[in-house]
Curated annotation (Swiss-Prot):
The lineage of its organism: Bacteria, Bacillati, Bacillota, Bacilli, Lactobacillales. The keyword ATP-binding applies. The gene is ecfA1. Its EC number is 7.-.-.-. Residues 5-239 form the ABC transporter domain. GO terms for cellular component: ATP-binding cassette (ABC) transporter complex. ATP binds at G39, H40, N41, G42, S43, G44, K45, S46. The active site is at E165. ATP-binding (A) component of a common energy-coupling factor (ECF) ABC-transporter complex. Unlike classic ABC transporters this ECF transporter provides the energy necessary to transport a number of different substrates including 5-formyltetrahydrofolate and thiamine. Expression of the complex plus FolT or ThiT in Lactococcus lactis subsp. cremoris (strain NZ9000) allows 5-formyltetrahydrofolate or thiamine uptake respectively; 5-formyltetrahydrofolate or thiamine are not taken up in the absence of FolT/ThiT or the EcfA1A2T complex. Deenergized L.lactis subsp. It is found in: Cell membrane. This is Energy-coupling factor transporter ATP-binding protein EcfA1.
């Protein structure tokens, strides 16, 4: 598959700042890929997300999305391709009801009403929120609010969804609820997903991970490759998945463990299989 995003030698400095927020950042994202971008607070993750759809303009370097180079002439076309779900959904809500809120972006784009109603219904159905169409967004749970925010993006039919710390304010159940929705949408619609996060378990969902540190790319690799550097992640203010900690502890006790990353469920299956052979 071809690349849907290409970033080359991207630099960005905030006005009045003494230090660059992003320094010589380069990477590609394949169509249909799930890419996680992790790093400590202030590492440049959200700045990078905002440079990808023109909320911020690169100081130098280039950003290409769906074959278009980001510029004043292309920014609105690129924003039609990229939807961002932010950390706090309350800051995105503008409609009196869930359905009104999902329709808001379509109204701004002049989508005819019959088509708008169809898209709103489809989007709410895809995220499992049809029964809440007439509810006030403020009365929903955190996970439900993020599902509505995702529906508002999906209704606009983007090619790329960026999750900018979208699960950081949710409890574990709400986090899994939202990630499950994104997983299904990615598979059903062929979406490309960029997950900006410091949550290691969320990053584990990705095909590849970019590790940012002080605005620079520290490493790019698969979850297995990134999580194998446990002490390095801890030094950078990040965590290591529980399953990786357990694998390391078992390996130190002389138990043969696979090198590939395993989530909790796969690790339990492996340990049961190992136990049955003893």
């Amino acid at each position: 598959m071809g690349n849907v995003i290409r970033v080359q030698h991207l630099n960005y400095t905030y006005p009045e700042a003494k230090q660059q927020a992003l320094t010589d950042v380069s990477f590609d994202v394949a169509k249909g890929e799930w890419l996680a971008i992790i790093g400590h607070n202030g590492s440049g993750k959200s700045t990078l997300a905002k440079n990808l759809n023109g909320l911020l303009a690169p100081e130098s370097g280039t950003v290409q999305v769906a074959g278009m180079t980001l510029s004043e002439e292309t920014v609105w076309d690129i924003r039609a391709k990229v939807g961002i779900v932010f950390q706090n959904p309350d800051n995105q809500f503008v409609g009196a009801t869930v359905a009104d809120d999902v329709a808001f972006g379509l109204e701004n784009r002049g989508v005819p009403r019959p088509e708008m109603i169809k898209r709103v219904d489809e989007a709410l159905d895809r995220v499992g929120m049809t029964a809440f169409a007439d509810r006030e967004p403020a009365r929903l749970s955190g996970g439900q609010k993020q599902r509505v925010a995702i529906a508002g993006i999906v209704a606009q039919r983007p090619e790329i969804i960026i999750l900018d710390e979208s699960t950081s304010m949710l409890d574990p159940a709400g986090r899994q609820e939202v990630l499950g929705v994104i997983r299904e949408l990615k598979d059903e619609l062929g979406l490309t997903v960029l997950s900006i996060t410091h949550d290691i378990d969320e990053a584990a969902e990705a095909h590849r991970i970019i590790l940012l540190n002080d605005g620079k790319i520290n490493e790019i690799g698969t979850p297995s490759e990134i999580f194998s550097h446990g002490m390095e992640l801890l030094r950078l203010g990040l965590d290591v998945p529980y399953s990786e900690k357990l694998k390391d502890a078992l390996a130190q006790r002389g138990i043969a463990m696979p090198k590939d990353y395993m989530d909790n469920e796969r690790l339990v299956d492996y340990l049961w299989t190992l136990h049955s052979t003893m």
